[in-house]
Amino acid sequence: MTQSTQTTPSNAASTTDTLLRLAAIIDSRKGGDPEVSYVSRLFHKGDDAVLKKIGEEATEVVLAAKDARHGGAPKALVGEVADLWFHCLVMLSHFDLSPADVLAELERREGMSGIEEKALRKSRDREQNGD
């Protein structure tokens, strides 16, 4: 059995710092040379290339999770999730968003049950659509 590293209040700041540092590096690749930077190449190719990578990486996470459940290496799952998170950071940057935006939304939802949050979201969507 592998040991999981849980985020606790004492190490949450360093986890957030890691995301923010990585996001800053990704942001710095905007306008960079697509011949020398993978991230610059994705930005240069546009929305479809960035979004396609999200789909590919999400599929790889699902497959790695299924493998891990059936005796595969948990480290492979962690690696695939890291790839997905990285490409999500690229996507956020591409759309001029940041990890702070996502963290703020998660904080807003914290302490609220998933059922309650979903009901509030549906109600808000109905109000916005004039239903």
UniProtKB/Swiss-Prot annotation:
> 4Fe-4S: is it a keyword of this entry?
no
Report what the protein is called. Answer: Phosphoribosyl-ATP pyrophosphatase
Provide the GO biological process annotations. L-histidine biosynthetic process
Q: Which organism is it from?
A: Paraburkholderia xenovorans (strain LB400)
Organismal lineage: Bacteria, Pseudomonadati, Pseudomonadota, Betaproteobacteria, Burkholderiales
Origin superkingdom: Bacteria
Query: MF terms per GO, please?
Result: ATP binding; phosphoribosyl-ATP diphosphatase activity
Pathway assignment reads: Amino-acid biosynthesis; L-histidine biosynthesis; L-histidine from 5-phospho-alpha-D-ribose 1-diphosphate: step 2/9
Show the NCBIfam families listed in the entry: histidine_hisI (TIGR03188), PRK00400.1-3 (NF001611)
Record localization? Cytoplasm
Which protein family is it in?
Answer: Belongs to the PRA-PH family.
Q: Give the GO cellular component terms, alphabetically.
A: cytoplasm
